[in-house]
Amino acid sequence: MTRVKRGNVARKRRKKILKITKGFRGSSSTLFRTANQQQMKALRYSYRDRLTRKRNFRALWIVRINAMARHLGLNYNQFINNITKAQIIINRKTLSQLAIYDSTIFSSLISIKNN
C-alpha cells in the first residue's frame, strides 16, 4: 500500500477554516479544532438569527403602529381591522414608516377608517 501524503489539501482546508474564524476570541481563531467548532456554531447561529430577524422586525413595526394609533385614539387591532375592511392593502413596514416620518398621512388613514 502506498503512503498518502495530504499536505496541500489538508493545509488548504485548515487555512480556509482559520481564515473564516479570523477575529474570533481566544483559541477559536488560532487552533484548528476549536476554530472548526466555533465556525460551525457561528453558521448555525447566523442561520437561526436570519429567521429570527424577520420576526423581530415585524414585532417592532407592530409596536410602532400601535403606539401611533393609540396616540390618535385607536389601538392596533382596531386600526388593522378598519384598514382591512376598507380594502386598503399596505404592509406593516410601510405603515410604521408612515407613523414615524409622515404622521399626517397616518392620521388621515385613521380618520378615513373611523368614518
Swiss-Prot record:
Molecular functions (GO terms): rRNA binding; structural constituent of ribosome
Keywords: Chloroplast, Plastid, Ribonucleoprotein, Ribosomal protein, RNA-binding, rRNA-binding
CDD domains: Ribosomal_L20
A GO cellular component entry from the record: chloroplast
Matching Gene3D superfamilies: 6.10.160.10, Ribosomal protein L20 (1.10.1900.20)
Pfam family, one: Ribosomal_L20
Xref: InterPro entries: Ribosomal_bL20, RIBOSOMAL_L20_CS, Ribosomal_protein_bL20_C
Keyword Chloroplast in record: yes
Biological process (GO), any one: ribosomal large subunit assembly
Ribonucleoprotein recorded as keyword: yes
Localization annotation: Plastid, Chloroplast
PANTHER family associated with the record: 39S RIBOSOMAL PROTEIN L20
Family membership: Belongs to the bacterial ribosomal protein bL20 family.
Reported function: Binds directly to 23S ribosomal RNA and is necessary for the in vitro assembly process of the 50S ribosomal subunit. It is not involved in the protein synthesizing functions of that subunit.
Identification of the protein by name: Large ribosomal subunit protein bL20c
Native organism taxonomy: Eukaryota, Viridiplantae, Chlorophyta, core chlorophytes, Chlorophyceae
